[in-house]
Amino acid sequence: MGSSFGHLFRISTFGESHGGGVGVIVDGCPPRLAIDIEAVQAELDRRKPGQSKITTPRKEDDRVEALSGLLDGVSLGTPIAMVVRNKDQRPGDYKEMQVAFRPSHADATYQSKYGIQARSGGGRASARETIGRVAAGAIAKQMLRQLHGTEVLAWVKRIHTLEANIDPAVPTLDAVESNIVRCPDAAMAEQMIERIESIGRDGDSCGGVIECVVRRPPTGLGMPVFDKLEADLAKAVMSLPATKGFEIGSGFAGTTLLGSQHNDAFLPTSDGSLHTATNNSGGIQGGISNGEPIVLRVAFKPTATIRKEQQTINASGEATTLAAKGRHDPCVLPRAVPMVEAMVALVLADHALRQRGQCG
């Protein structure tokens, strides 16, 4: 329960951080699509640990194995199973956390719900669970690009109190990947890196905001009233670890505008397609995509597992303290960029198939 996502383009992830491996089954991918497994690997490389001085030092190759659903790089229309083996587990780092709950982590709520949990490495609450999502999202990206010419791109917009002012129409993948924090503003990226390093040296952590744009999305995605596109996007990205907020288009800032300022005026086009003068709606109106770029932002909290001593309780409810050991990200944002892209791509792929099924 709770490990599957989607309707027609449906995924199920499996595995724990310190188990034998993690992976995903993708069901519903159309047949006869060219699927580049190295493109899947490239996405996993963007999210893997140990990639820079501001991420966890855990060393994992995160090499993906495609077990089914592909033949000579072409989708068969049958379930695509992919797995990544875990290799660098250190259960000993979690001895203290097996008797004391990490504040603001899933340890306590998992124990309360199930009466048992895989505390070593965080189990299903670990960010390693997102390997399956990123692998599946890479398949969804390839489908969207081939069938609709759609691009999904995200970047770090804010780290702690440092925020970059970025026009969503400008960033490229090369610009995002040009630095280890994945912020396309090079000057701001340097400040962000220094901030993460400083906070990490103090044994603490920080959060921030990731912005994502969908360029050339199909028109008509989304269904009234409970399957609105932005509602499904919100559910998708808010299911990622450490997420605490979501906004689309003008978001909360739009509440300060008047209707005459916020409304996106329609403009005539030669082909009769929808086009607006502004994009405060973020590419979605009435829960349905209008063809303009979809722009959304996701807030991530500071990493819960930190080296600073904190007050907590043990499994018996007794007061204790915890200074966590192990290898943990001082900031999840740089590695979360491909995770956000993956979840957005999965929603769009699913809705594209649903739109084709209902409306042709």
From Swiss-Prot:
It holds the Pfam family Chorismate_synt. Homotetramer. It catalyses: 5-O-(1-carboxyvinyl)-3-phosphoshikimate = chorismate + phosphate. Belongs to the chorismate synthase family. The keyword Flavoprotein applies. This reaction introduces a second double bond into the aromatic ring system. It comes from Synechococcus sp. (strain RCC307). FMN binds at R124, A125, S126, G286, K301, P302, T303, A304, T305, R327. InterPro entries: Chorismate_synth, Chorismate_synth_AroC_sf, Chorismate_synthase_CS. Its cofactor is FMNH2. Pathway: Metabolic intermediate biosynthesis; chorismate biosynthesis; chorismate from D-erythrose 4-phosphate and phosphoenolpyruvate: step 7/7. Reduced FMN (FMNH(2)). NADP(+) binds at R47. Its EC number is 4.2.3.5. The gene is aroC. The keyword Phosphoprotein does not apply. GO terms for cellular component: cytosol. It comes from the Bacteria. This is Chorismate synthase. One of its GO terms (molecular function) is FMN binding.
